[in-house]
Structures are given as structure tokens and as C-alpha cells.
């Protein structure tokens, strides 16, 4: 099983995938985030954040106040399972997390916490 995926983000406020499947044989999983647009991160920055689907709205709203220097995430937010930093055009960042943190029977989601992006930039994470 390939225990990694590359997710591209764009100036059109989108990720190139709406669903990430993790093979249950993976002990860890790595997400590399790229930005194929041309806009800088203060204008059209994106990050990749993993949480339970239920925690997603709260993380995003709390993150707005944190600002770009904290990647639009509240410091020490225990609801965040994994995240990249905010990147702009031509940049990339990656994060590796322990698959055992994903409990069976819980719905997980990924999203961008840049203010206003969550409505378009989100998807599901499942372990199969």
C-alpha cells in the first residue's frame, strides 16, 4: 500500500481531491500539499488540516482569530489531528501522522482553515 498522497491546491479555492483513502496496513500516512496557483499565501493561502468531521467547523472558526502566522489554527488545538502550514503559490509542505489516531466508526475530514475557504475546500478521510 502507498501510505502517502499529494494534494494540490489552487487559486480557485479548491483541492484536487474530495476523498483520501488510507490503507489500514499503513502505520503512518503522509500528505504533501502543493499549490499550483500564482497567488501569494496572504491572498490565497491554503493548508491541509485533519480532524473529525464533527470538530471541523469549530476548528475553522477558532482558527480565524489565530491569524496567518499561526496557520489559522488555534495554538495547541487538541481537535487537530494533523496539519500543514499555510502555503502560497509554488510552495509545498507535508505532514505525517499516526494512522492509529483515527478511530473506527468516526467520520474524519480534511479542510483548509484559511478564512472563508472551508465551504469549498474540504473532503473525507477514510481508513479501509
From Swiss-Prot:
Domain Plastocyanin-like: 1-128
Location (main, coarse): periplasm
UniProt cross-references to Pfam families, sorted A to Z: Copper-bind
GO molecular function: copper ion binding; electron transfer activity
Keywords: Copper, Disulfide bond, Electron transport, Metal-binding, Periplasm, Transport
InterPro entries: Azurin, BlueCu_1, BlueCu_1_BS, Cu-binding_ET, Cupredoxin
Disulphide bond pairs: 3-26
Residues noted as binding Cu cation in the record, renumbered to the chain: 46, 112, 117, 121
Highest taxon of source: Bacteria
Localization terms from the record: Periplasm
GO CC, one annotated term: periplasmic space
Function: Transfers electrons from cytochrome c551 to cytochrome oxidase.
Identification of the protein by name: Azurin
Organism: Pseudomonas fluorescens biotype A
